[in-house]
Amino acid sequence: VEDTLRIRRFVEDQKPKTAVLAGGGFIGLEMAENLAEMGVSVTIVQRPKQLLAPLDADMASFVHAEMRRHGVALRLGETVTGFRQDGDSVLTLLEESEPLHSDMVLLAIGVTPDTHLAKDAGLRLGIRGSIAVNERMETSVPDIYAVGDAVEVTHFVTGQKALISLAGPTNKQGRIAADNICGGNSRFHGSQGSSVLKLFGLTAASTGINEKA
């Protein structure tokens, strides 16, 4: 929320005309939509050759068309290597082509669990440094619970441990943990990662796994 307010204040005060956005996931696309509707010319740089990785490529093509139809430029399959100040603008350095000039740059390149506190406390960690919990959302240390983007969960479709950084599962985990802390016996059995995004005039949704998985 603080980042959102800071970005909005910057746009209102500095009135940037151009923006480069690194990352083409849900947050990145929502940010691109909002900036475009505020009159900012947006370019999205994305290392994979499609936006919204959970979608299959043929479905993502509809998202690409909608973004371009609203003036958002796409640089797919390109890698950001760094940034450099150039007077009043910022240069976004690309591995495959010439730098991009813009008035502002935003990073929306995913979520990594920040679990230093859990590690220091001796809690067992899971995939990619996430916090391992049981179905009661209890960690490896009795009476210590964890929920949200930093915990690993079971993916319904694959049966494997996964990181699913979505508000819906987090909300459910929080209620289950609270119930157990208060003496209940609720269980979180996993998630299949259902998500939906409204983007300009298009609605894109996904659930489960895609062809790449």
What is the predicted function of each stretch?
Residues 160-165, 169, 179-211:
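Active-site-proximal substrate-binding core of FAD-dependent oxidoreductases
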Residues 1-14, 99-180:
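FAD-site-proximal beta/loop scaffold in flavoenzymes
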Residues 28-29:
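N-terminal Rossmann-fold NAD(P) dinucleotide-binding loop
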Residues 37-135:
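A Rossmann-like FAD-binding core segment of flavoenzymes
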Residues 22-25:
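Glycine-rich Rossmann-fold phosphate-binding loop(s) that bind the pyrophosphate
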Residues 13-18, 77:
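Phosphate-coordination loops involved in phosphoryl transfer and adenosine-cofactor binding
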